[in-house]
Amino acid sequence: MPAYRSRTTTHGRNMAGARGLWRATGVKNSDFGKPIIAIVNSFTQFVPGHVHLKDLGQMVAREVEAAGGIAKEFNTIAVDDGIAMGHDGMLYSLPSRELIADSVEYMVNAHCADAMVCISNCDKITPGMLMAAMRLNIPAIFVSGGPMEAGKVTLGDGRKVSLDLVDAMVAAADDKISDADLAAIEEAACPTCGSCSGMFTANSMNCLSEALGLSLPGNGSTLATHAFRKNLFLEAGRRIVEVTRRHYEQDDASVLPRAIASKAAFLNAMSLDIAMGGSTNTVLHLLAIAQEGGVDFTMDDIDALSRKVPCLCKVAPNTANVHMEDVHRAGGIMAILGELDRAGLIDRDCPTVHAPTIGAAIDQWDIARSNDPQARELFLAAPGGVPTQVAFSQATLWPDLDLDREHGVIRSAKAPFSKDGGLAVLKGNVALDGCIVKTAGVDESILVFSGRAKVYESQDAAVSGILTGKVEAGDVVVIRYEGPKGGPGMQEMLYPTSYLKSKGLGKACALITDGRFSGGTSGLSIGHVSPEAAAGGTIGLVRDGDRIEIDIPNRSIRLAVPEDELAARRAEQDAKGWKPAQPRQRQVSAALKVYAQFAASADKGAVRILPE
């Protein structure tokens, strides 16, 4: 029987001082011996996805206490990728994931907490906390802040459209859009608290937490503003005490993160990711989370799944006017998992924090097969249409559910958006260890593409080239030395891809990089090229005018340069050192240098690898 970790600090004569300090936080004599549950919050006023979380940690704490536990809250940092985008602030985004994981470990281990409820939401916070959960392997339940409502605007020509943050970015660089329309788009794009409303990285990761079995049904899609989301927080507080007691008092290891998020659960999550056309960043994060838990989940697994899992759901940025609120109306993540289950693409036996197996959860919560009144009510939660930063502030309901699996937001495997899934792994001489493309966002006309390289040594240089007309139809924009080591920090490339769209080149150009992309990216955008340029990858040998051949159906990417020429270039580059040809005006802090020193390549999740 495992001993409660917290008794290290609450029991024994030698812990009199520690008990005195616990009492100073509000713990009473009668509380000693109860499980101590860490409420791992991430409230900040910098991030719309987290601005409403301030009081939610204490809401969970009260439920923990009512269920017989001691609740103690702390906060992690949270970087807003949208605000950090397009300048050197983006260098800090991915490294913040490791800092979040470390800070959770530090707090939980320093104070010997028995379990935790993780309140996350945006891009690096959910994966950072998931990494910590796998690392610590104590009972954990995730509940995120929820998606933002989509913006609604009427343009000058009378068109009414749903939109999001990325629409504002694209519109800003489109000379055809009037100042008045741009102002209207900007003001309407982000109307409420919550994670940005498309299937971007934040929402993708919160959806995947459902498939991993570590969060409750509806976590990925119930709007931040809706009253129904409150139930997820209350249930998390109650349930964490139950599963904690099962582990420590009944010796039940099946409730631990590593037992729940097994290899099979990661395959389920990746199948969901491919089916819903999630952000390419999810690949990076799932690899990192798996590594923390010692799970043998690799790019080869992702490649194999991408060849058999169809695309069953298309959401912004992969299609216009469809956002997370629409996915929710169609049954949310449990509905997509249900369609994958019907196609034999889900392992039903994986346990979860809320049901004995994911199969049992699907049977209850998939509205296409279940008449469970709780499920059918949950997925009627609709946007309120009122700008707000207050959680649970509206209770609007859809008039009906979207159960159309032939033409609706969620499709069956018999009527998919495409037989090929929404993500693919490409390999070839320019990416020997692989790279990632979000096929759900690629137009069918350019699934096979060949073009001349236009090489840039930084994201800033590429943006300048695109905006000044130096990039033309038929070009393959190459942005290098932006990987985990080379950036450092592996910046997102949302501005270059958005500007290609605004210049009318979204279907006429490709972009490849050893950096990564925002979840808001679409188009022929190929990221995570591994090995990266700074690690001696072939992408560092590409020269202007070289032909690059991309064949997504055959999963290949090739630099059409003879091997002897590449060998000569490599010898020349070895002599010079693997660094940008033109010096960059970039201030790299000591903190970023530490990350770069230990960062692995993208195919390993860009985690830190310590020397043995």
Curated annotation (Swiss-Prot):
<keyword id="KW-0456">Lyase</keyword>
<keyword id="KW-0408">Iron</keyword>
<feature type="binding site">
    <location>
        <position position="196"/>
    </location>
    <ligand>
        <name>[2Fe-2S] cluster</name>
    </ligand>
</feature>
<feature type="binding site">
    <location>
        <position position="123"/>
    </location>
    <ligand>
        <name>Mg(2+)</name>
    </ligand>
</feature>
<comment type="similarity">
    <text>Belongs to the IlvD/Edd family.</text>
</comment>
<keyword id="KW-0100">Branched-chain amino acid biosynthesis</keyword>
<dbReference type="GO" id="GO:0009099">
    <property type="term" value="P:L-valine biosynthetic process"/>
</dbReference>
<feature type="active site" description="Proton acceptor">
    <location>
        <position position="518"/>
    </location>
</feature>
<dbReference type="Pfam" id="PF24877">
    <property type="entry name" value="ILV_EDD_C"/>
</dbReference>
<dbReference type="GO" id="GO:0005829">
    <property type="term" value="C:cytosol"/>
</dbReference>
<dbReference type="GO" id="GO:0004160">
    <property type="term" value="F:dihydroxy-acid dehydratase activity"/>
</dbReference>
<feature type="binding site">
    <location>
        <position position="81"/>
    </location>
    <ligand>
        <name>Mg(2+)</name>
    </ligand>
</feature>
<keyword id="KW-0001">2Fe-2S</keyword>
<dbReference type="InterPro" id="IPR037237">
    <property type="entry name" value="IlvD/EDD_N"/>
</dbReference>
<dbReference type="Pfam" id="PF00920">
    <property type="entry name" value="ILVD_EDD_N"/>
</dbReference>
<dbReference type="GO" id="GO:0000287">
    <property type="term" value="F:magnesium ion binding"/>
</dbReference>
<dbReference type="InterPro" id="IPR020558">
    <property type="entry name" value="DiOHA_6PGluconate_deHydtase_CS"/>
</dbReference>
<comment type="subunit">
    <text>Homodimer.</text>
</comment>
<comment type="pathway">
    <text>Amino-acid biosynthesis; L-isoleucine biosynthesis; L-isoleucine from 2-oxobutanoate: step 3/4.</text>
</comment>
<dbReference type="GO" id="GO:0051537">
    <property type="term" value="F:2 iron, 2 sulfur cluster binding"/>
</dbReference>
<dbReference type="GO" id="GO:0009097">
    <property type="term" value="P:isoleucine biosynthetic process"/>
</dbReference>
<keyword id="KW-0028">Amino-acid biosynthesis</keyword>
<protein>
    <recommendedName>
        <fullName>Dihydroxy-acid dehydratase</fullName>
        <ecNumber>4.2.1.9</ecNumber>
    </recommendedName>
</protein>
<keyword id="KW-0411">Iron-sulfur</keyword>
<feature type="modified residue" description="N6-carboxylysine">
    <location>
        <position position="124"/>
    </location>
</feature>
<dbReference type="InterPro" id="IPR000581">
    <property type="entry name" value="ILV_EDD_N"/>
</dbReference>
<feature type="binding site" description="via carbamate group">
    <location>
        <position position="124"/>
    </location>
    <ligand>
        <name>Mg(2+)</name>
    </ligand>
</feature>
<dbReference type="InterPro" id="IPR056740">
    <property type="entry name" value="ILV_EDD_C"/>
</dbReference>
<feature type="binding site">
    <location>
        <position position="492"/>
    </location>
    <ligand>
        <name>Mg(2+)</name>
    </ligand>
</feature>
<dbReference type="InterPro" id="IPR042096">
    <property type="entry name" value="Dihydro-acid_dehy_C"/>
</dbReference>
<feature type="binding site">
    <location>
        <position position="122"/>
    </location>
    <ligand>
        <name>[2Fe-2S] cluster</name>
    </ligand>
</feature>
<keyword id="KW-0479">Metal-binding</keyword>
<keyword id="KW-0460">Magnesium</keyword>
<comment type="pathway">
    <text>Amino-acid biosynthesis; L-valine biosynthesis; L-valine from pyruvate: step 3/4.</text>
</comment>
<dbReference type="InterPro" id="IPR004404">
    <property type="entry name" value="DihydroxyA_deHydtase"/>
</dbReference>
<comment type="function">
    <text>Functions in the biosynthesis of branched-chain amino acids. Catalyzes the dehydration of (2R,3R)-2,3-dihydroxy-3-methylpentanoate (2,3-dihydroxy-3-methylvalerate) into 2-oxo-3-methylpentanoate (2-oxo-3-methylvalerate) and of (2R)-2,3-dihydroxy-3-methylbutanoate (2,3-dihydroxyisovalerate) into 2-oxo-3-methylbutanoate (2-oxoisovalerate), the penultimate precursor to L-isoleucine and L-valine, respectively.</text>
</comment>
